[in-house]
């Protein structure tokens, strides 16, 4: 038994994700060229780590050769507080108000991956949340969740 994309999206919604898209894993040469040009122009500033794994970042198959599909998700991290609630001279970004989003997303994504693995012991997958050499915006765009610009 293998799950359909509809079933996977429904399960992701059950886990709390508001946005779910699935893209076929493929090479994205234009995006890889954009990354290389961006790095050559030193537009990464102090983020030198981006250059360290640019070959993996620029081509998903260099990072995860077995990839067949990429599931991209979105989760609203608004917790209902405002800057006025702080009553202070400093500000926090919305993502910093709640629990560490890396942990929250990873837990939900591992639950989704483990559920998908029920369909077949041959399913292979990895969970990436903001720290892996993956161009997440590219995959979100490819999955129909938005655009880059």
Task: Indicate residue ranges for each PLM-predicted region.
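Auxiliary alpha/beta "docking" domains used to position bulky ligands
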Residues: 1-149
């Amino acid at each position: 038994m293998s799950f359909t994309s509809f079933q996977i999206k429904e399960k992701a919604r059950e886990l709390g994700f508001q946005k779910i898209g699935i893209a076929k894993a493929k090479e994205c040469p234009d995006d890889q060229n954009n990354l290389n040009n961006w790095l050559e122009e030193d537009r990464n500033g102090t983020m030198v780590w981006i250059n360290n794994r640019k070959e993996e970042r620029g081509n998903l198959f260099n990072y995860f050769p077995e990839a067949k599909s990429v599931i991209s998700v979105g989760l609203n991290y608004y917790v209902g507080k405002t800057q006025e609630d702080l009553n202070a001279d400093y500000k926090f970004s919305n993502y910093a108000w709640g629990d560490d989003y890396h942990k929250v997303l990873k837990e939900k994504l591992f639950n989704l991956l483990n559920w998908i693995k029920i369909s077949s012991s041959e399913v292979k997958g990895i969970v990436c949340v903001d720290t892996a050499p993956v161009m997440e915006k590219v995959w979100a765009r490819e999955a129909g969740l938005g655009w880059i610009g």
